[in-house]
Amino acid sequence: KSIMKKLKIEIDYDFCQLDELSEQDLNLIESAKAAVKNSYANYSHFHVGAALRLHDGRVVIGANQENAAFPSGLCAERSAIFAAQSHYPEQAIDALAIVAHNEKGFLSDPITPCGACRQVMLEMEDRYKQNVRVLLYGTSGVYILKSVKDLLPFAFVDENMRK
């Protein structure tokens, strides 16, 4: 008879204020904040902006786009990633910043991506064999994660289908 083992998953992440960020990371968050203006969120009134920095330093933005048939919309993160992959498929993503704004303004707590976006973000790490730093903005501060895997600990990637 085997004995069940109790296992634990922990992640390390940083929490900082905007004035503690590098100029490059601050600019990425500011680009994501500017992208919120391109959001079409007539139904939820929840506007999300994303900005990603490619390996060559180029920044690509995305904003959520809602549709009356809710599954037909697209989140800001995937909007930015798919735009980057369509225009610059040879460029890995080094970092991704996400911000959100409701009817009261930017959220106090850092915004986190939905499960579908986490999976697409993870695919970029797997595709280019490098981590994507994730910056999650709130007016109270910024969470910084070293890898998308920190958001998706039981990750499903191509390798899982080959074992």
Which residues does each PLM region occupy?
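C-terminal binding/interaction regions
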Residues: 3-38, 82, 88-163
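Short beta-strand scaffold segments in enzyme catalytic cores
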Residues: 47-54
